[in-house]
Structure formats: structure tokens, C-alpha cells
């Protein structure tokens, strides 16, 4: 039987974890062999009510009717939560889920907040499924789309990218800047990136192994790696829903740093701006020389002209030097070779599993 791994990045998501687990478990009942002990974030109900709920879950599981309706194979599932150093009650809630659902829920706790990309990387490293689905816990990535992603995988696609057609929680400015980011990225990079692709995607075991072995940069953009790694790809359009509690953890500053690092990581074109600027400067100088010779007049006099030209030239020069500095900063991060993340504790997992499996 094939295995399905669902990797969920969690950072201060206590307000939405209960809703996410309920929604995801309901979907998994339709496509996977899942067994659930009673799990709730409030006080446990009466024993009679608990038995009734367990009996109903077992009945739904045994019938297999949902799996037939979804039109996909039967899978054995694991729900892998990666706690990215949360400071709220998320770690406690995740541990409770893991203890009450040992056959389904796995939890990885980081020693501190390493970032969303690091959390997805940990899920990539520890997941054991034949098909891996990455999503967030705020329900903007709807679990109801999991069966459709599985169907695409069963059709033979190794990469299933989810493309946003609408984002209910994003304003006009964020949507415009997102479109501009992909426009610039596709112009600067020799690779093609699907516009409005999100961190909601699925990959096969083969793609997972390639990403684990060859894509180990410290400054990361996993969804970009997924789109650039090759293999057969397909897309599914979806509308991102409203956040079910909490707020976005991406500030304007974080988005700027993330966008800048991504552009620099996937393109060396900015390094060539110095050549372009030098050609433009030489061309302007040649025009000025021809103008002087034809009119038999001296070069334009006055301090204003000289100051403007010098300011322009130094602006171009420092801009190019700044770009080179950004690339050197990226190289510096790679040379330090510090870990992408540090695991402090795991639940229902072997903490040393990934280190044992690594052969590179």
C-alpha cells in the first residue's frame, strides 16, 4: 500500500490547529487508512459520548464509501507537523494530538524559530510517504483539495503545484506585489516559475530524494526548487480562503528579504548590470564626443553638468557594488555551513532518522 505524507508548518497557530486537524482528518478518512483516538482541545466528553464518536469513526473507516467517491487508491497516511519554535500553546496542542493519534500524527519541534522554509525542509527530510503534500495550518490551503492532488499523482505527475486564482485575505497591494515578483523573477531567471504558485504543493518520492540530496542551500526557496527540478508537472487552480485565526507572520520586511534572496539565488543577471552600465556610459561619452566634434564647440561648461554626471556615475557604481555585496552575503551564509534547522524533540518519530538515512 502506498503512503501519503502531509507536511504542515506551524508557527503560533493555536487558534487554527483544532479546525485544521478536524478538516484534514475528515478528508483523510475518505482516501486513507486512518485510525483516530478521540482528540479535542477542550475537556474530554462523557465516556458514553466518546465511545459513540469512536464507533462512528470506525464505521466510516470500514465502509470505504468515501474512498470510492473520491476515485483514488487507498493510502496509509502520516500527518507530519513541524513546530517552528512557536511561543504560544501550539507545541502543547501538537504533543496532545501526537499522543492521542500515534498512528497518524508525527511532530517535529525546532529548538528555535528557523523560518518557514526550514520547517518545510524538515518535513521534506523526515517524511516517509510515496507522495508528499506541503501545506499550512491556517486553512488557507484547504485539505479538501488533497484527493484532487492524489488523482494527479496517480495519473503519473511527479509535481503538483497549486496556483492561487484569488486570495481572500490579501489586499490589492499584496496581490500586485506578488504578481510583480513573479514577473521580475521570470524575466531575470533562465527558468520558468508558475505565477502565483504557493507553498501548497505535492511531490513524489523521486522528487523528494533529489531535493534532499542536491538542494541543500542555506538561503532557501523550496517552491522554486520544486518548479525547477524537472520531472512531469501539472497545476491545480484554487482560491485561498480566509485565515482561521491568528495573523500572517510575513511582515513587509520579511517579504522584502525573501524576495531579494530568491531573485539573487535564481539569477546571475544582476551581476551583469555593471557591464551594462559601463556600455551605457561609454555610449553616452561617445555621443558627447561626436557632438563636440561636429559642432566644434567645447564640452558643456559649468559645474552643474559635471556634478550631475558624477552623481549619476557614482550612483550606478555603488548600485553595482551593492549587488555584488548581496551575492557575497549569500556566499558567506553558505560557507558557514550551519544547519538549516535544529530539532529539539520529536513525537512518534526517530529523532535520528534523517541523519541515518543521509548518504551525502
Residue ranges and their predicted role:
Residues 3-5, 78:
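Cell-envelope/extracellular polymer assembly enzymes that use nucleotide-activated donors
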Residues 13-35:
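Short, well-formed alpha-helical segments that are part of the catalytic scaffolds
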Residues 3, 223-360:
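Hydrophobic helical membrane-anchoring modules
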Residues 83-91, 139-140:
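A conserved acidic beta->alpha catalytic loop
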Residues 32-38, 71-85, 108-109:
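Short beta-strand/loop segment that forms part of the nucleotide-sugar
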Residues 96, 108-112, 116-126, 131, ...:
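Acceptor/aglycone-binding surface of glycosyltransferases and processive sugar-polymer synthases
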Residues 18-19, 88-96:
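Acidic helix N-cap motif at the loop->helix transition within catalytic regions
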